[in-house]
Amino acid sequence: MEPILLQTSEADAGTRLDACLARAIEDLTRSAAAKAVEDGRVLVNGKAPNKSYKLTGHEQIEFTPEEPAPIDAVPQDIPLDVVYEDDDVIVVNKPSGLVVHPAPGHPDGTLVNTLLYHCGDSLSGVGGALRPGIVHRIDRDTSGLIIAAKNDYAHQFLSAQLADHTLARTYECIVVGNLREDSGTVDAPIARDSRDRKRMAVVPGGRRAVTHWEVIARYPGYTHVRCRLETGRTHQIRVHMAYLGHPILGDTVYGAKKAVPGLTGQCLHAVGLQFIHPRTKDLVSLTCPLPDEFTAMLRKIDR
């Protein structure tokens, strides 16, 4: 596989090499990083370091990923909350903690596996063998509505709506702190964080990202917010809320690192989905209720 090149800075000085790699490379654990060093798949300034090497800053690291084991998306009988289904599309309410499609870090137990069990062969092949039917994604620790296509025509029709921003997606979240205004728009470009490849960040020259938001309710130290995506970048709402200085409650990547008791993920739920049906051309508007964890947190912060 092609090596990944990383450049360290003074801020990395004193950090163990394996810890730096695990922080910087998506889906790489610290133990896997240490093994890569032992296997000779990591070079620092062109030389093989020992596994306890500590960075001094301003090094160039070359990391060669291990060849991944083949992944085969297989049907698995996992509970599926179907909100809408016909011959062309299926919309489900994804729980927090469920990954959308197989990848090296999670080869099974995903939404794709359960869709294959539920739908059989009637999923579009446009997304490839590991993403059959998947038109868009939501993060593992985000819950709510996600649509999948049952044939290639439906997939292409829905993808076109996604591209021209007519497939409307609405989210609700709880953010830390009190937003000054009652509504607003964040128009700030997003790209991968150069310091940590697992994170996204607002970066000049990144891909355009637009989030419209409005306050639903205010609580001491928290705000219940509705967000509408105009674009759909990776981690967009999470990045934009943190950019405003109000990270989403429970988001350990862009907010406080400590998990919130009672939450399995962040308080972010895809509550609404609106699209033109690929076959009938009718407008379909769907909603789903907030998960129990979310409503329990609203009660808790209202005390």
Model regions and ranges:
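RNA pseudouridine synthases
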Residues: 1-185, 189-194, 293-301
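Thr-Gly-centered strand-to-loop micro-motif
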Residues: 44-45, 101-102, 149, 200-202, ...
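Short alpha-helix capping/helix-loop boundary micro-motifs
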Residues: 45-50, 221-224, 259
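Conserved "cap/hinge" positions at secondary-structure junctions
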Residues: 46, 65, 239, 257-258
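Short, surface-exposed secondary-structure edge patches
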Residues: 50-54, 226, 265
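Conserved hydrophobic positions within beta-strands
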Residues: 82, 175, 212-215, 248
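The conserved catalytic core of RNA pseudouridine synthases
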Residues: 128-160, 167-168, 172, 187-244, ...
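Short, surface-exposed loop/helix-turn segments at secondary-structure junctions
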Residues: 249-262
